[in-house]
């Protein structure tokens, strides 16, 4: 996970933050987060979900394996307990949280079943969500561009469907499921392209791997795949969520 996200907080926010901040509210609603609870944000990144939980009057702790993101979290939330730790090895005792949440995380951990089992160990309720690939306009357009220009983009594809999320959590108990839809806006295509070039995640690594000729072809084809926007535009994204009360 960390090798795809060894970037600064500003770069991550520029690329994905415009989506993750909008997702945090619906995800917290789905997870049943209530004021006064104690919650753990697993794979907290730069703190989009953390900020939402704090705003709801929740006592929050956060974990992320990336040293860069852990530093950002401590700077942005100096009063919170932040641990540099992977989802598969959380440094808290059994049952100390009311809820453990992982937003946009499980596709990128080395052992997702171990991660959700560890979340179930430390919390009485577990909730996870991941973007679908085809259901996110940006990723779908990038995939089509990759196919047209003949490059070799890679993206973790597991846990990107409702069934995969259900099956991941099913060993822990009865699973509740939901689809969470958000939109993100851009001033213009240049803003979108610049965010993509920040090197964040699989999409950013794909862009960084292209030579000058392929990069220019990607720039032109992706513009076409997004509908050749001439000004402000929005892109849709859908996350598949699951929650369980381990029993």
Protein language model annotation of sequence segments:
Residues 1-9:
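N-terminal, positively charged/glycine-rich alpha-helical extensions of SAM-dependent methyltransferases
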Residues 104-107:
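Short catalytic micro-motifs in class I SAM-dependent methyltransferases
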Residues 4-5, 19, 46-48, 158-247:
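Conserved Class I S-adenosyl-L-methionine
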Residues 18-35:
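Conserved alpha-helix/loop element of class I SAM-dependent methyltransferases that forms part
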Residues 101:
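A conserved beta-strand element that flanks and buttresses the S-adenosyl-L-methionine
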Residues 125-151:
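Conserved class I S-adenosyl-L-methionine
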Residues 38-90:
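Class I SAM-dependent methyltransferase SAM/SAH-binding core
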